[in-house]
UniProtKB/Swiss-Prot annotation:
Zn(2+) binds at residues 490, 493, 509, 515. This is DNA ligase. It comes from Bifidobacterium adolescentis (strain ATCC 15703 / DSM 20083 / NCTC 11814 / E194a). GO terms for biological process: DNA repair; DNA replication. DNA ligase that catalyzes the formation of phosphodiester linkages between 5'-phosphoryl and 3'-hydroxyl groups in double-stranded DNA using NAD as a coenzyme and as the energy source for the reaction. It is essential for DNA replication and repair of damaged DNA.
Length: 892
């Protein structure tokens, strides 16, 4: 084990504001848990747990290198968990694992059975299409087997399947192969049996051979016809129509709203809601749940002897079957496409990957099928799935993880918010480790306990949401769980917490002036793009300015001033730390900023001695052979050491001056032989002796870090910020950029706004009474003698901030009087710049969709606002149409 001491490459606080690497040092990779054991080893198998996190590690197992005994042990453990997952999902309608975890376990079993055929048997969970049926409904044999689909999770796997189909059919790659692409509905599979055009039975998929008879419930679904439409000669004697029962997003939201109004627990997602509704013992309950159905397959089809030759539609392929269904009045997904190349398949995947939140139901992938039914028969099937179809699964938007803790966070206006601390989990393209719980009432409503397995969703938005607990995972763990208790005092300053007024759900810290957490958040706000836009003044540097002792250790037992990292070998534990005799904690620092008032008077000299606390990481180093055959060392961060040291926040670590070339020696300089930057401060001198025996004095200096210099330059530019940006920077409650811009435009000067009344502000279009009262309350308080707000205004005005006239937009007012909502992400605009573009052209950039909305701009990963616009019939625009709207005020 090696403890790395401080050196001249000491890390600055800036490294935490801007974590980009220049590639000059080895990457440090986070890891935990089973990672210290070899995947597939005896110890690894024994340590494996039925958690989602451990399920995702199964993909790392090299099955080919395992012994038969180890493979059998792993198969037995994983098979038991898969079977439990199937029962929970298909029978109990109460899944305990995320879809991603279930898929990973199933893939592991399939790999083991392929490598060790003795593990494969008809009883394996891999051959079971769904769960075995429960005893609540009569079991009925399907007239023809109802199969599931194999899943793939990458484009490479999809390409392998596609090439396998071409090989299986001996199909030339240059010849178009007709296929269908369909969105994979996240619902429940259903087999509808019609005899002579009359609905006879509705069966769940069950295990694919036998399903549950839920006919009475099926008859309550309004989109499923009781009788097939069309002339008698086009109605078959017998047909099985396969499809999916699901709940539309709008119906799901209505159902949950009704549940909450009635004091019932809301459903976690539409799939669970549909499952619970379809398998109700009382069909009258199912009838109230607004279920929907789309057909996506065909089973047995017999036209019967009574049909004259060619008197009915011949069904040769999948797409023809869908056209026939439409004639019969059976709904088919409007999102289906016919394709003839792999590129067109990828186009479909890309399109719905970007528009997952835009359609009427939840989806988790794209299903690709060979269109020709004759070719389907040629390709055949495995024991559980057809070879002529595949399901490409998108990264999950909803996963399970562990709720490690609930902490509280103090915002810039004093609002104290519970924050869920999660075991890091990958969801919808990024790793999530924290998410807001809004207020203590929301924690109570969701019913989560610290230690719970919880569902995390990130659908249609960049902000993750904690949906609720997985109640099945509480069994046997009740003693490990605890309730969240909202603190009664501010964790930052100790002030007593309370609602701002009676009836408020939000709890606030009243110590607005002196609470370090509130000041830090206000500094972060004023530096943001929506206010002064001060680059390089990020979260960590704001903390360094306002609360540099935030992570100060409680005692010398965890103070290690000379240890910046601890290096261990694989499997090695760090040695216990013993502080040296006589070690004392450094004196407490006084923050550079105690108020926003001092921001524009900051100099680099003020920042010279600011230091912040950093925890020394534990770094595991192991050797591996690179692609060039050479041995290289790989660094992996395996956790924090619990030992803390200080680093300079804004100035560099001590640096030895670079020696000048002989021709560049400057005899007029204080150190003729060395280069010392003009802004450097020499902190010591060292005697250097050359090989020839001559000596020189080498200075060692510190200087403002490059990002510090840039930050101060940006602060200087911010003195001339637009008036509306100054208003946002003041952190007035409820006042955001759009309303700040409107007020600045209406009054013209900061002095006029300071003395405006509630009535005067309320008369401005788009300014409600609550915003008007917030503005007047803030400036009224600022006029009181000794009030910190007044001190901020006076200091900023003295620095030249906010003293100019509001600049009118020189752009044509193409959107005057119009309301535009932007949802999702756009390529050419950030969310704020899109709203700014609307406001600069006279429009209102609203945050929600209503009947008063004129247009909704829909970008990538748009959420419920797009669905709301569709429901209200409001025109929806893509990015190109949005640009046209900005230029002309109309869209062709």
């Amino acid at each position: 084990m090696t403890m790395t001491n401080r050196d001249d490459s000491e890390q600055l606080a800036w490294d935490f504001d801007a974590p980009e690497s220049d590639g000059s040092s080895a990457a440090v990779v986070a890891d935990e848990g089973l990672a210290s054991l070899t995947p597939g080893s005896e110890r690894w198998i024994a340590a494996l747990q039925p958690t989602d996190a451990d399920a995702m590690r199964l993909d790392k197992v090299d099955v080919a290198s395992m012994s038969a005994e180890a493979a059998a042990r792993l198969w037995a453990r994983v098979a038991a968990w898969v079977e439990s997952d199937q029962i929970a999902y298909y029978i109990d309608d109460a899944p305990v694992s995320s879809d991603a975890a279930y898929d990973a376990r199933l893939r592991c079993l399939q790999s083991l059975e392929a490598q060790f055929p003795s593990l494969d048997s008809p009883q394996s969970p891999t051959h079971r299409v769904g769960g075995t049926f429960s005893n609540d409904f009569a079991s009925v044999r399907h007239p023809s087997r109802m199969m599931s689909l194999d899943d793939v999770f990458s484009i490479e796997e999809l390409r392998e399947w596609y090439d396998g189909v071409l090989r299986g059919l001996d199909w030339p790659e240059s010849k178009p192969l007709p296929m269908t692409c369909e969105v994979k509905i996240d619902g429940l599979a259903l087999n509808l049996i019609y005899r002579n055009g009359v609905l006879e039975q509705g069966l769940t998929r069950g295990d694919g051979v036998t399903g549950e008879d839920i006919t009475l419930n099926v008859r309550t679904i309004s989109t499923i016809p009781q009788n097939l439409a069309g002339p008698e000669e086009d109605i078959p004697e017998f047909v099985e129509i396969r499809g999916e029962v699901f709940m539309r997003w709008d119906d799901f939201n209505k159902l949950n709203a009704e549940n909450e109004d009635a004091g019932r627990a809301p459903f976690a997602n539409p799939r669970n809601a549909a499952a619970g509704s379809l398998r109700q013992k009382d069909p009258r309950i199912t009838a109230t749940r607004r279920l929907s159905f789309y057909a996506h397959g065909i089973g047995s089809l017999r036209w019967g002897a009574g049909h004259a030759g060619n008197g009915h539609d011949v069904v040769n392929d999948q797409s023809e079957a869908y056209e026939l269904y439409k004639k019969w009045g059976v709904p088919v997904s409007p999102h289906n496409r016919e394709v003839t190349s792999f590129k067109e398949i990828l186009d479909m995947i890309d399109y719905y990957g970007e528009h997952r939140g835009d359609i009427e139901h939840a989806l988790d992938g794209i299903v690709v099928k060979v269109d020709d039914l004759g070719l389907q028969r040629s390709l055949g099937a495995t024991s559980r799935a057809p070879r002529w179809a595949i399901a490409y699964k998108y990264p999950p938007e909803e996963v399970n993880t562990e709720l490690l803790d609930i902490t509280v966070q103090v915002g810039r206006t004093g609002r104290v918010t519970p924050v869920a601390v999660l075991k890091p989990v990958y969801v919808a393209g990024s790793t999530v480790s924290r998410t807001t719980l809004h207020n203590p009432f929301e924690v109570e409503r969701k019913g989560v306990l610290i230690g719970d397995t919880v569902v995390v969703r990130k659908a249609g938005d960049v902000i993750p949401e904690l949906v609720g607990p997985v109640l099945e995972r509480r069994k046997g763990r009740e003693g490990e769980l605890r309730r969240f208790v909202m603190p009664t005092r501010c964790p930052s300053c100790g002030a007593e917490l309370a609602p701002a007024k009676e009836g408020d759900k939000d709890i606030r810290c009243p110590n607005v002036e002196s609470c370090p957490a509130q000041l830090t958040e206000r500094i972060i706000n004023l530096a943001s793009r929506k206010a002064f836009d001060i680059e390089h003044l990020g979260d960590q540097s704001a903390i360094a300015l306002t609360n540099p002792e935030e992570d100060r250790p409680d005692s010398i037992d965890t103070y290690a001033p000379n240890i910046t990292e601890i290096v261990v070998k694989p499997g090695e534990e760090p040695e216990p730390y013993e502080p040296v005799a006589g070690l004392e904690l450094p004196p407490m620092q006084t923050p550079v900023l105690s108020s926003e008032a001092g921001l524009f008077s900051l100099t680099s000299a003020d920042l010279k001695d600011v230091r912040v606390w950093r925890e020394a990481p534990i770094i595991e180093i192991h050797e591996t052979v690179g692609s060039n055959g050479k041995i290289k060392k790989v660094r992996k961060r395996v956790g924090g050491s619990g030992l803390w040291h200080q680093v300079p926040a804004f100035w560099t670590a001590p640096t030895a001056a670079r020696k000048r070339k002989e021709a560049d020696i400057d005899e007029t300089a204080e150190y003729p032989q060395y280069v010392v930057p003009d802004d450097a401060v020499v902190i010591r001198e060292e005697i250097k002796v050359s090989r020839g025996g001559t000596s020189s004095v080498q200075p060692v200096y510190i200087r403002p870090a490059e990002n510090t210099r840039k930050m101060l330059d940006e602060m200087d530019k911010a003195r001339h910020a637009d008036l509306w940006r100054v208003l946002v920077a003041l952190s007035i409650r409820r006042l955001g950029p759009p309303t700040a811009r409107t007020i600045a435009s209406a009054f013209g000067t900061l002095d006029a706004i300071e003395h405006a009344s509630v009535d005067e502000l309320s008369q401005i279009d788009g300014i409600g009474s609550e915003i008007a009262e917030s503005v007047v309350t803030w400036f009224t308080a600022a006029r009181e003698p000794g009030n910190w707000r007044g001190a901020v205004l006076d200091a900023w005005k003295a620095a030249g901030v906010g003293v100019g006239q509001a600049q009118a937009s020189g752009l044509p007012q193409t959107l005057a009087g119009k309301t535009v909502v932007v949802t999702g992400s756009l390529e050419g605009f950030s969310r704020d710049s899109a709203k700014e573009a609307i406001v600069l052209r006279g429009g209102k950039a609203a945050g929600s969709v209503s009947k008063k909305t004129d247009w909704v701009v829909v970008g990538e990963n748009a959420g419920s606002k797009a669905a709301k616009a569709e429901e209200l019939g409001i025109p929806m625009l893509n990015e190109d149409q949005f640009k046209q709207l900005l230029d002309t005020g109309t869209v062709e």
